[in-house]
């Protein structure tokens, strides 16, 4: 339980997408502990989580109407929802490519378009990218979607800055969640070999940063991109990961 009258985000209304489990649930819980009134959403809602398909413009419009009627304004948006497909360049189908773009890139764009008009000066938007957005990571649909999200974030920071609204991007590396649980052991081992800290991350490595970026303590930070990846993108060594995932690749010595 949280006390919404105290804490760093007391009195703030914050929307979190993809909040039914994993990283999104951890972010929502951390924001609530900081005093925010959290509107948790997910395409597969559970409990108090509200249903929201981030790729649906009508869903976003409906949420915006509800928020305006209930609160008048909101103060934060965490675009956390995302999906992954692991097909390589020559394998991916255009329909699957488009689906990933719809959730990972168009979803945050729609969220900003519909909810930023409800935000007063001092509000903050956090887009959850990926270390894939800083490299040539092999799953082409996922990587392209996160690179595109970087562009959306930069433009939003520029255009919303004069209104006093900040937009920043967090780039998680290999974080232990349901999404990464579906990865193969070969992928996990290859990724950890390229991670200087030598371990995977947890949702608790991400959530505190999201809280900080929504707080007044970060009031002069906008347009920033912050990797939380154990150093994976410090050297850009994703080719070995890509090579490890090839079915015709020789075993590492």
Spans of features found by a protein language model:
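Short C-terminal tail/terminal secondary-structure segment
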Residues: 2-5, 222-253
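Conserved glycine-rich cofactor-binding loop
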Residues: 13, 20-21
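Substrate-binding pocket helix/loop in short-chain dehydrogenase/reductase
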Residues: 88-89, 96-98, 191
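A short, exposed helix-loop element centered on a Lys and neighboring polar residues
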Residues: 112-113, 154
């Amino acid at each position: 339980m949280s006390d919404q009258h105290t804490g760093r985000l007391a009195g703030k209304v914050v929307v979190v997408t993809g909040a039914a489990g994993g990283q999104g649930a951890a972010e929502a819980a951390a924001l609530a502990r900081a005093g925010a009134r959290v509107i948790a959403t997910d395409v597969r809602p559970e409990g108090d989580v509200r249903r929201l398909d981030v790729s649906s413009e009508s869903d976003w419009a409906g949420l915006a109407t509800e928020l305006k009627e209930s609160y008048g304004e909101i103060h934060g948006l965490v675009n956390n929802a995302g999906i992954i497909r692991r097909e390589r360049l020559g394998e991916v189908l255009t329909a699957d490519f488009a689906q990933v773009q719809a959730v990972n890139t168009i979803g945050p764009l729609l969220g900003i378009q519909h909810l930023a008009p409800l935000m007063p000066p001092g509000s903050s938007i956090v887009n959850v990218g990926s270390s894939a957005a800083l490299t040539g990571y092999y799953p082409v649909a996922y990587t392209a979607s996160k690179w595109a999200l970087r562009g959306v974030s930069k433009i939003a920071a520029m255009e919303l800055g004069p209104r006093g609204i900040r937009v920043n991007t967090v780039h998680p590396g290999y974080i232990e969640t349901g999404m990464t649980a579906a990865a193969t052991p070969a992928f996990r081992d290859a990724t950890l070999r390229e991670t200087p800290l030598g371990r995977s991350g947890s949702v608790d490595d991400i959530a505190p940063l999201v809280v900080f970026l929504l707080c007044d303590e970060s009031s002069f930070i906008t347009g920033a991109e912050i990797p939380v990846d154990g150093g994976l993108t410090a050297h850009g060594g994703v080719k070995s990961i890509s090579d490890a995932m090839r079915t015709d690749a020789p075993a590492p010595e």
